Amino acid sequence: MTASFDVIVIGGGHAGCEAATAAARMGARTALVTHRLSTVGAMSCNPAIGGLGKGHLVREIDALDGLMGRVADAAGIQFRMLNRRKGPAVRGPRAQEDRKLYAAAMQAEIREAANLVVIEGEADDLIVADGRIAGIRLIDSRAFKTGAVVVTTGTFLRGLIHLGEKSWPAGRVDEAPALGLSVSFERIGFTLGRLKTGTPPRLDGATIDWAAVEMQPGDDPPEPFSVMTSRITTPQIRCGITRTMPATHEVIRANVHRSPIYSGQIRSSGPRYCPSLEDKVVRFGDRDGHQIFLEPEGLDDTTVYPNGISTSLPEEVQLAILATIPGLTKVRMIRPGYAIEYDHVDPRELDPTLQTRRLPGLFLAGQINGTTGYEEAAAQGLVAGLNAALAAGGGDPVVFDRADGYLGVMIDDLVTRGITEPYRMFTSRAEYRLTLRADNADQRLTDKGIAMGCVGAGRAVHHRAKMAALSAAKALATSLSVTPNEAARYGLSLNRDGHRRSAFELLAYPEIGWGEVAAIWPELSAIDPGVAVHLEIDAKYDVYLKRQTADVEAFRRDESLVLADVDYDAVPGLSNEARARLERARPRTVGQAGRLDGITPAALGILAAYLRREARKKTATASA
């Protein structure tokens, strides 16, 4: 073998960039293997980062010193906080990105990262020795030795593009697929499935009639993703909004038999929550129109991404569709939309560190695990990279659970339940939404990142200063109080019960905000506005957070009951069905067992009682 590394990451997309830099931050000698450095960090589909649920993941990546938030801030050309009118728990930061700036910023991060080298080439085979991963071989026969491999191949594993009746092998447009790795996975014993995703046509913005569409500005001022970004300096743009028309739907209905999805050419599952335009028309036939967001792809690029009309219909049909849409009747299509099928591994083959159970030292992240989306991929990449570095160095693994963050929710969903279609993150997937907010990701995760060694010194100093300021602000707000009569002088109506209420308690009232309490106590005006926002949210949710804390403690009790090496045939009282499901899934804890289909509360009680009995036996044996 020509060289040796602690960790090798295959693939330079969103998962691969986070995995490689996370491993490198942990001190592992890391190599990132990618076809070309010039395509590292490319946004293959939509030119946007974040959104509902997804924005939470970006903030969590940032809290652990990952790249996506900082890079998105550097390249963002329109920032919007989605669900702003709803509670903070379900708000989702989102940014429209300049594709070229995003890739350039990501490539700069990769080039400047310590402990990281980039190897241009195609990984073709996994090398196994003594029952664990030992290295990789490239298609040009170069081989590299390693202690851990992270595979982040996106849509490249036996990728097949579909456009109308035509199809051809590709990882994405104009790029070859990865064929050898699929063979390698099958040789090792993995069963590969097929999934599908799609992308819309790209349009020439210079030929769009912008006067015929609604224009949508971003937030002013824009709110960054990263706590390390003081302000956004990139020029901001507006997006357009238009709709499909009944005439659009007629064109689609007349040609739907030519869509690979409906002709039988594609049999794999696509993302339920990001359907193709032909899917929308067939499934929602009563709708007279579907919204389309016209998203510019860059400040010096006229290309526009029409979000909402992903399609794989033939090129001439796509042109006919566009001609029926307001603002697009004379548009020039730069590139047609298409669908792509690719191989994936059943994520139930993984443990919560994203290491495969079948082959120690092999980690998987991103679309190979059945997810869809840049943010889902990046979060998995970070977790896989951290754990690959720990595995290569002989350290203890790090597991993020469902109470830690959305990245823990996603990974637990994947490794426990598996997937039948591409997995996308939503806030509704999290049980502890009030705790797992986008605004407090650093409060939840950065201390953990500092302890494990993946957070740099600059961020650690910034975080400690912020937490000290928040603590001091809460102490001040808790120390200041008024009676109901005193509050009435400031126009605040409270229950006349004679009880004094602190500024923090007043903030819990829906109609009382920071401005009202600062009017009573001018000293509160000296508190940093960002800290004040956090304090007000904490106050509004305080009583509910206390209840949720009890729920989290109960969850963690179940998670602490470890099922390692349990012989389920030796557990009396379990049904044959429960035994079979537990043996097949091999859950890590009683809590994880409870999230398996078909495992009843009675079965969980039997498992908990069995573990307690076994623990008592071990204690008795040790003391004898």
Swiss-Prot record:
Entry-linked SMART domains: GIDA_assoc_3
Transmembrane segments: none
InterPro entries the record matches: FAD/NAD-bd_sf (IPR036188), GIDA_C_N (IPR049312), MnmG (IPR004416), MnmG-rel (IPR002218), MnmG-rel_CS (IPR020595), MnmG_C (IPR026904), MnmG_C_subdom (IPR047001), MnmG_C_subdom_sf (IPR044920)
Protein's cellular compartments: Cytoplasm
Positions annotated to bind FAD: G11, G12, G13, H14, A15, G16
GO biological process: tRNA methylation; tRNA wobble uridine modification
Sites where the protein binds NAD(+): 270-284
Family affiliation: Belongs to the MnmG family.
Name of this protein: tRNA uridine 5-carboxymethylaminomethyl modification enzyme MnmG
Taxonomic lineage: Bacteria, Pseudomonadati, Pseudomonadota, Alphaproteobacteria, Hyphomicrobiales
